[in-house]
């Protein structure tokens, strides 16, 4: 199933129509969501968070980040959407420039900073940094081929995603870290992590509950995977029998399929929405930010 075929499925068409009405003033079922943000470390104080619409969730974006700028050796910190966007714009410019110039060193630094910003860098011995170091000798070529695949009109919801390097078939890496790199590498590609997956799953559940008075199973086209939180007090599983959603695991192909479906949904929504998102510089990024905030706890 490619993008066109996916978006033309009846249940996807219905979900998009419902999704686009969420922030309309005349919506009989306005979207509201609230939770308490758990304190990091040993603290017990919880911070209440609530939104009265999808757009309001974007307006209330807050996420603490820090990373080291490998080009200036400065430590950069922030919490707001605008400061985070400034960092992402810088990463994206450096990433694209390095690929144009075929400079693996600059490309590696840009990717390293993206992962560091996202809190998913890992180390030289394990995790995303280890994988990045393995790819470093041919990183610009590798990412160029990944970009070509993900931006193709013919990319499908397949069982595996690979590229051929030195006559060897290499599986495309995908997890909560690499989705951040691909989001800045490719056009119309959102960051799909556990929180975004949880939010989309929750919205699908609400849609199905409102659409069908008689409960039904979640159609595969709208089955999004959520990610478990590290904190056991943070629930990101929106399942409510018979609406059952699955958790992301270590399968790159499953993560990519979910990311592609989310890309297509968010891109289509951003082009057709009559909400305040349309007035933003990058509607898809703003919608992603809203989903990220909603999906902290469901």
Features from the language model and the residues they span:
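Generic structural signal for hydrophobic core residues of well-folded globular domains
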Residues: 114-124, 181-188, 200-203, 269, ...
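Helix-hairpin-helix/helix-loop-helix acidic hairpins
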Residues: 84-170
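Eukaryotic partner-binding/assembly regions in large regulatory complexes
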Residues: 44-111, 118
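Catalytic cores of nucleic-acid editing and processing enzymes
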Residues: 133, 141-153, 167-172, 210-213, ...
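C-terminal accessory module of base-excision DNA glycosylases/AP lyases that mediates lesion recognition
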Residues: 1-65, 194-199, 203-298
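Alpha-helix boundary/N-cap detector
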Residues: 10, 79-86, 102-105, 109, ...
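Short, solvent-exposed positions on alpha-helices
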Residues: 105, 190-194
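Helix-hairpin-helix
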Residues: 161-186
């Amino acid at each position: 199933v490619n993008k066109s075929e996916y978006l033309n499925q009846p249940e996807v068409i219905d979900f998009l129509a419902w999704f686009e009405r969420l922030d309309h003033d005349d919506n009989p079922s306005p979207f509201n969501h609230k939770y308490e943000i758990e304190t990091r470390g040993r603290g017990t104080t919880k911070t209440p968070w609530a939104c009265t619409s999808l757009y309001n969730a974007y307006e209330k974006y807050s996420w603490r980040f820090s990373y080291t700028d490998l080009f200036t050796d400065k430590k950069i910190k922030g919490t707001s959407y605008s400061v985070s966007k400034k960092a992402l714009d810088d990463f994206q410019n450096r990433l694209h420039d390095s690929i144009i110039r075929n400079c693996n060193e600059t490309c590696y630094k840009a990717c390293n900073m993206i992962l560091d910003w996202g809190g998913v860098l890992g180390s030289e011995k394990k995790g995303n940094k280890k994988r990045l170091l393995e790819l470093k000798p041919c990183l610009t070529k590798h990412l160029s081929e990944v970009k070509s695949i993900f931006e193709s009109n013919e990319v499908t919801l397949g069982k595996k995603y690979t590229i051929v390097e030195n006559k060897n078939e290499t599986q495309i890496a995908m997890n909560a870290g690499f989705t951040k790199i691909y989001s800045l590498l490719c056009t119309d590609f959102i960051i799909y992590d556990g929180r975004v997956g949880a939010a989309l799953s929750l919205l699908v559940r609400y849609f199905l509950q409102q659409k069908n008075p008689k409960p039904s199973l979640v159609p595969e086209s709208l089955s999004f995977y959520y990610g478990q939180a590290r904190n056991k007090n943070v629930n990101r599983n929106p399942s409510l029998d018979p609406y059952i959603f699955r958790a992301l695991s270590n399968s790159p192909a499953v993560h990519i399929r979910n990311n592609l479906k989310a890309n297509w949904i968010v891109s289509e929504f951003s082009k057709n929405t009559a909400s305040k998102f349309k007035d933003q510089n990058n509607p898809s990024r703003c919608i992603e930010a809203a989903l990220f905030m909603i999906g902290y706890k469901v």
